[in-house]
């Protein structure tokens, strides 16, 4: 590490907020390319985080870089509304072609939480209803409105008193004994019956369905632990919304743009929402997001009811267009399904060898590896942190999720190869071995 880097690292704790300076692992890097980061230490690291599900086509893809350079030669800033430009109009057209159902009208912003804020405002405005129902464990952002529907961790809401116009029902929980058969397998019909009961009680005792504008959820629980519900469970949510004339919002900030093996998780599960929030993988690292609805719904949201200065930036829109091209041209959705299935097979083999691995949760290349205490079978977030450190020493970068940080989050670029999966999981296995040695676990564990 250079003297300048060392100095800057020492200063980071005082110059950057703790959420930036003290997150895990804060790896100092100088370059990114494909599925790799290049550290200031000269080490090449295999990246299984994709910038937290952002660089789905790989880091610094040449086509994205070229699109950014060409766009910057013409326009660097809008704002849309004051002027119009080709990239935002073309992007809206191309997104409409890949989104499910009739989701074809857009309000562009910069980040996932902004897209959620827009979705909540739109739903309340057009329904003229004040309340929103969200699901326990879901994460939708850290601004005031999105925080009000986020319950993945209580610390995110501490002292902030998010507005009280929200209610929660439990998200699908695959370990809930009420929905399991004698072999411990999920009975989907029981899960749907339980969901129906939760909503019935909510509408009976807490809030009238006639006052609920929207139900919002992540089709795959992301920050809350990569919980994957059955398609029938999501279909039941859709049915309940239809019955009560409530709008359904999907937060596809993390699941979108091929992560689940389809363009969006809505297509993976065959359930189409009324409103969708998209971000992260849309522009390969440039700030861009969108609140999406059908034309009829969006046109009820008049001029001045929402706004943006930077949303739909022309350079970001150009990067998004190039991102869509790469996803199509390189068949990355197919690769996500194929390589994702291969990764799951390899992880299941690891699970057979290491009792500290609880469940493997995967759809496409959205993969969670639960770590538990082999003796108590309880989630072990402390173990995850140490295992991630050891894996980084081996040369692979993972992230974490779950209420207790108990899940290793594996979200490589959709361009990842089977060989790179092998490399990364070999490194993870070596980290597991070292962790067992450090903690003096018996060989059988």
Swiss-Prot record:
<dbReference type="GO" id="GO:0042802">
    <property type="term" value="F:identical protein binding"/>
</dbReference>
<comment type="similarity">
    <text>Belongs to the class-III pyridoxal-phosphate-dependent aminotransferase family.</text>
</comment>
<dbReference type="InterPro" id="IPR015422">
    <property type="entry name" value="PyrdxlP-dep_Trfase_small"/>
</dbReference>
<protein>
    <recommendedName>
        <fullName>Uncharacterized aminotransferase BpOF4_10225</fullName>
        <ecNumber>2.6.-.-</ecNumber>
    </recommendedName>
</protein>
<dbReference type="InterPro" id="IPR049704">
    <property type="entry name" value="Aminotrans_3_PPA_site"/>
</dbReference>
<dbReference type="InterPro" id="IPR015424">
    <property type="entry name" value="PyrdxlP-dep_Trfase"/>
</dbReference>
<keyword id="KW-0032">Aminotransferase</keyword>
<dbReference type="InterPro" id="IPR005814">
    <property type="entry name" value="Aminotrans_3"/>
</dbReference>
<dbReference type="Pfam" id="PF00202">
    <property type="entry name" value="Aminotran_3"/>
</dbReference>
<dbReference type="GO" id="GO:0030170">
    <property type="term" value="F:pyridoxal phosphate binding"/>
</dbReference>
<dbReference type="InterPro" id="IPR050103">
    <property type="entry name" value="Class-III_PLP-dep_AT"/>
</dbReference>
<keyword id="KW-0808">Transferase</keyword>
<feature type="modified residue" description="N6-(pyridoxal phosphate)lysine">
    <location>
        <position position="280"/>
    </location>
</feature>
<dbReference type="InterPro" id="IPR015421">
    <property type="entry name" value="PyrdxlP-dep_Trfase_major"/>
</dbReference>
<dbReference type="GO" id="GO:0008483">
    <property type="term" value="F:transaminase activity"/>
</dbReference>
<keyword id="KW-0663">Pyridoxal phosphate</keyword>
């Amino acid at each position: 590490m250079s003297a300048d880097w060392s100095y800057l690292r020492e200063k980071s704790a005082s110059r950057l907020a703790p959420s930036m300076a003290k997150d895990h692992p804060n790896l100092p890097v100088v370059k990114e390319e494909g599925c790799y980061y290049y550290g200031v230490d000269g080490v090449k690291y295999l990246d299984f985080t994709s910038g937290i599900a952002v660089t789905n086509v790989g880091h610094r893809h040449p086509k994205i870089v070229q699109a950014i350079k060409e766009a910057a030669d013409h326009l660097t800033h809008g704002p849309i509304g004051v002027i119009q430009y080709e990239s935002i109009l073309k992007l809206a057209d191309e997104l409409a072609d890949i989104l499910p159902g009739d989701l074809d009208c857009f309000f562009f912003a910069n980040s996932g939480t902004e897209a959620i804020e827009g979705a909540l405002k739109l739903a309340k405005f057009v329904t003229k209803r004040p309340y929103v129902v969200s699901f326990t464990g879901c994460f939708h952002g850290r601004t005031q409105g999105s925080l009000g529907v986020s319950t993945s961790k209580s610390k995110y809401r501490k002292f902030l008193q998010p507005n009280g116009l929200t209610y929660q029902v439990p998200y699908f929980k695959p370990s809930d004994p009420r929905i399991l058969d004698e072999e411990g397998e999920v009975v989907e019909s029981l899960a749907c019956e339980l969901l129906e009961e939760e909503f019935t009680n909510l509408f009976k005792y807490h809030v009238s369905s006639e006052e609920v504008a929207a139900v919002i959820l992540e089709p795959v629980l992301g920050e809350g632990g990569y919980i994957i519900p059955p398609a029938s469970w999501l279909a039941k949510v859709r049915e309940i919304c239809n019955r009560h004339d409530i709008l359904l919002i999907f937060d596809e900030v993390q699941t979108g743009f091929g992560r689940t093996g389809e363009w969006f998780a809505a297509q993976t599960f065959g359930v189409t929402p009324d409103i969708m929030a998209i971000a992260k993988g849309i522009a390969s690292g440039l700030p861009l997001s969108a609140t999406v609805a059908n034309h009829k719904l969006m046109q009820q949201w008049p001029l001045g009811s929402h706004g943006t200065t930077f949303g739909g930036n022309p350079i970001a829109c150009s990067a998004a267009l190039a991102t869509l091209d790469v996803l199509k041209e390189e068949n990355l959705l197919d690769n996500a399904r194929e390589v994702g299935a291969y990764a799951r097979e390899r992880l299941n083999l690891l699970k057979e060898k290491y009792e500290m691995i609880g469940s493997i949760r995967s759809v496409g290349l959205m993969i969670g590896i639960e770590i538990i205490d082999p003796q108590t079978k309880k989630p072990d977030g402390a173990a995850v942190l140490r295992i991630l450190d050891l894996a980084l020493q081996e040369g692979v970068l993972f992230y974490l999720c779950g209420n207790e940080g108990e899940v290793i989050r594996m979200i490589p670029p959709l361009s990842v190869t089977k060989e790179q999966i092998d490399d990364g999981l070999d490194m993870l296995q070596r980290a597991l071995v070292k962790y067992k040695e450090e903690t003096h676990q018996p060989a059988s564990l």
